[in-house]
C-alpha cells in the first residue's frame, strides 16, 4: 500500500516538474501622447494623438525550456501596437520573431532579429530610441537597418566585459539585388562605461555592396549619464553617403529624469540638418511614467531631414527643402 501511495505521489508530481523546466512571459509597453507637429512646410502643422512617442507600443511573448546541462531552448515573438487606432504593424510579429538555443556559448537565434548595429545604437542613445530627435531617425528613414528577416544570429555572453555578435541574412533570390546581409558587433562594459561598434555589408549580385557603420560610447556616473554615437550608411550610387552624429546627456533625481540631445545629419550631396531635443520624465511607479518632450530641427537649403520618434515621423516633403520641423508632446507610458 505504501508503495502504491508513493507511486501515485510521484506520478502526480511529474507535470509540476515539467512545468518548472519551462516558462513563458507576456510583456509589453503601452505608450500614448498628444502632440503638436509641424514639418515646417506650408500646411505642415497638425495636432495628433500618437502611439509610442517615448517607446514603441508593443505586445510580446518570450519563453525558454531547460534542456539540461546549461542548455536552453528560447523563443520571442513581438508585435507592434498602435494605441491611437488599435491597429497592429503590417507584419503581425514584425518587431521580433525568433527561436534558438542559449547556453555557455551565448545565444543562437533564427528568424527576424535586431541587427548588430541596432544593438549598439540602442545602448548609445540617451533618449532610448524614443522621443523626437533620437538616433532612431537613422533607421526609420531607411538609411540604416534596424531589423532583418531570414537571419541567423549569434551573441556571446560577457567575456571579461566584452561581447561579440554576428548575423547573416539571406535575400532569398537568385537573380537581381540579393541584399544578403552580413553584420558584426563588439562591445565592452566596465562599471558605468560602455563602448561599442558594429558593421554591416549588404551583398548585391550586380551593383556592389551597401555598407553601414556605427561607433558609440556611454558613461554613467551617479545621477548623470552621457551617450553618443556616429553612424554612417554608404549605399551603392553617387552622392548617397549618409552620416549622423548624436551626443546627449540625462540627469535623474528621485522620480524626475531630464534629457537633452543634439544630432547632426549629413548627406554627401551637401544636405545638412541639426536637431535638438529636450525631454522630461516623471515616474509615477516602477512601471508607469508621464513625459513631455520638445524638439526642433534646422535644415540647410538642401536638407529635408525630419524628426522621428518611436511612433511617428515629422519630415518635410522632398518638394520643400530647407523646411524646419518642430514637435511638442505630452504622454504617458506603462510597461508590464
Language-model features and meaning:
Residues 1-21:
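Gram-negative bacterial Sec-dependent N-terminal signal peptides
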Residues 9, 60-62, 98-100, 153-155, ...:
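Outer-membrane beta-barrel architecture
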Residues 21-36, 46-171, 178-180, 187-191, ...:
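Outer membrane beta-barrel
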Residues 22-26, 65, 69-73, 104-108, ...:
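Outer-envelope beta-barrel architecture signal
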Residues 27-33, 76-78, 111-113, 165-169, ...:
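Transmembrane beta-strands of outer-membrane beta-barrel proteins
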Residues 50-54, 90-94, 143-147, 175-181, ...:
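Transmembrane beta-barrel outer-membrane domains
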Residues 181-282, 295-296:
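Detector for outer-membrane/organellar transmembrane beta-barrel domains
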Residues 322-336:
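Outer-membrane beta-barrel "beta-signal"
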Amino acid at each position: 500500500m505504501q508503495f502504491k501511495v508513493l507511486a501515485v505521489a510521484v506520478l502526480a508530481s511529474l507535470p509540476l516538474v515539467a512545468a518548472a523546466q519551462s516558462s513563458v512571459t507576456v510583456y509589453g509597453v503601452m505608450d500614448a501622447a498628444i502632440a503638436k507637429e509641424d514639418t515646417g512646410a506650408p500646411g505642415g502643422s497638425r495636432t495628433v494623438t500618437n502611439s509610442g512617442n517615448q517607446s514603441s507600443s508593443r505586445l510580446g511573448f518570450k519563453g525558454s525550456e531547460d534542456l539540461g546541462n546549461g542548455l536552453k531552448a528560447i523563443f520571442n515573438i513581438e508585435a507592434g501596437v498602435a494605441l491611437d487606432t488599435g491597429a497592429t504593424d503590417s507584419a503581425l510579429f514584425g518587431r521580433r520573431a525568433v527561436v534558438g538555443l542559449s547556453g555557455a556559448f551565448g545565444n543562437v537565434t533564427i528568424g527576424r532579429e535586431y541587427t548588430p548595429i541596432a544593438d549598439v545604437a540602442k545602448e548609445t542613445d540617451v533618449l532610448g530610441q524614443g522621443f523626437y530627435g533620437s538616433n532612431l531617425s537613422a533607421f526609420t528613414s531607411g538609411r540604416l537597418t534596424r531589423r532583418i528577416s531570414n537571419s541567423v544570429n549569434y551573441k556571446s555572453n560577457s567575456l571579461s566585459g566584452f561581447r561579440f555578435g554576428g548575423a547573416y541574412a539571406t535575400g532569398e533570390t537568385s537573380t537581381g539585388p540579393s541584399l544578403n546581409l552580413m553584420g558584426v558587433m563588439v562591445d565592452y562594459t566596465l562599471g558605468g562605461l560602455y563602448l561599442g561598434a558594429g558593421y554591416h555589408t549588404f551583398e548585391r549580385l550586380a551593383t556592389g555592396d551597401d555598407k553601414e557603420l556605427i561607433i558609440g560610447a556611454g558613461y554613467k556616473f551617479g545621477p548623470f549619464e552621457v551617450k553618443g554615437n556616429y553612424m554612417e550608411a554608404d549605399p551603392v550610387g553617387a552622392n548617397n553617403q549618409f552620416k549622423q552624429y548624436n551626443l546627449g546627456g540625462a540627469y535623474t533625481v528621485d522620480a524626475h529624469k531630464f534629457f537633452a540631445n543634439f544630432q547632426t545629419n549629413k548627406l554627401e550631396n551637401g544636405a545638412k540638418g541639426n536637431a535638438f531635443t529636450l525631454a522630461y520624465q516623471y515616474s509615477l511607479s516602477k512601471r508607469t511614467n508621464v513625459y513631455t518632450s520638445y524638439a526642433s530641427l534646422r535644415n540647410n537649403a538642401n536638407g529635408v531631414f525630419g524628426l522621428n520618434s518611436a511612433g511617428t515621423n515629422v519630415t518635410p516633403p522632398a518638394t520643400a527643402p530647407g523646411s524646419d520641423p518642430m514637435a511638442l508632446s505630452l504622454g504617458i507610458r506603462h510597461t508590464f
